[in-house]
A protein has these predicted regions:
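Short Pro/Gly-enriched beta-strand edge/turn motifs at strand-loop
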Residues: 40-47, 131-136
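C-terminal edge-of-domain segments
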Residues: 2-23, 142-209
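Short, basic/aromatic recognition patches
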Residues: 20-43
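Charged, amphipathic alpha-helical segments
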Residues: 27-31, 80, 129-130
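Short gly/pro-enriched beta-turn/loop segments at secondary-structure junctions
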Residues: 39-41, 70, 90, 145-149, ...
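Short beta-strand segments
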Residues: 42-79, 85-88, 93-99, 104-112
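Short N-terminal helix-initiation segments at or just after the protein's N-terminus
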Residues: 3-15, 35-40, 56, 89-99
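Short, structured beta-strand-loop surface elements
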Residues: 82-149
Length: 209
């Protein structure tokens, strides 16, 4: 099913997407530019679905690591928080990133909660103690063996992102020209990484590993 509110005939209904889509790019360049952008942002919004209501909930999360050549994302979590309940009920997830220049990325996939001690220790950082606290019972101390510390691994399925391809002055001029002429502004490199491209990238990195 799709939504449409009008018929533009033989005219392109979404000229912005047509003008900014960057399709002649290798999978390697697509993924590497995406992962560089994500690493620079560091903080993203994680969106999950609440099991009993179906409501979408987002919260800010700090990137803790990347796997599969950068396409799969790692986050710390308190296993007793609401987001782990959401993921246990529905593993579908979205992670989005945005910077002050208007560049953005959206990764759609599935999430898994990992409590394996070796994995937790691999990604553990002492600053986690500031978020979990020390409950004073000798077990829940915010350290690497605190059973409340888990890992959320986001296995990417698809990704869409936009990075800027022109200077700020050029973008302003392009937008002004668009307002005057009615022609869509060309200001971003709008890229999509398909499910097949994600699978290809993940497989190629497994062979390297």
């Amino acid at each position: 099913m799709s939504f449409s509110n009008t018929n533009t005939g033989d005219k392109i209904a979404d000229p912005y997407k047509e003008k900014n889509s960057d399709v002649n790019v290798t999978i390697k360049e697509k993924v590497e530019d995406l992962t560089d952008f994500i690493s620079a942002c560091k903080f993203g919004m994680m969106t999950t679905r609440v099991g009993d209501s179906g409501a979408l909930v987002s919260r800010c999360m700090a990137l803790a690591g990347k796997e599969s050549g950068g396409i799969d994302l790692i986050f710390h979590t308190n296993t007793e928080s609401g987001k782990t309940d959401d993921i246990d009920s529905d593993s579908h997830i979205n992670i989005s990133f945005l910077n002050s220049s208007g560049e953005w990325a959206s990764i759609s996939g599935t999430a898994s909660i990992i409590t394996d001690t070796a994995v937790v220790e691999r990604y553990y950082h002492p600053t986690l103690k500031a978020w979990l606290g020390d409950l004073g019972d000798g077990t829940h101390d915010g350290g690497p063996h605190d059973p409340r510390i888990g890992i959320i691994k986001v296995t990417a399925r698809t990704a869409t992102y936009a990075v800027i391809k022109k200077s700020a002055i050029s973008r302003v001029a392009e937008i002004a020209q668009g307002v005057t002429t009615g022609k869509a502004a060309s200001v971003n490199k709008l890229r999509e990484i398909s499910e097949q491209e994600v699978a290809t990238w993940r497989s190629s990195n497994k062979m390297v590993e």
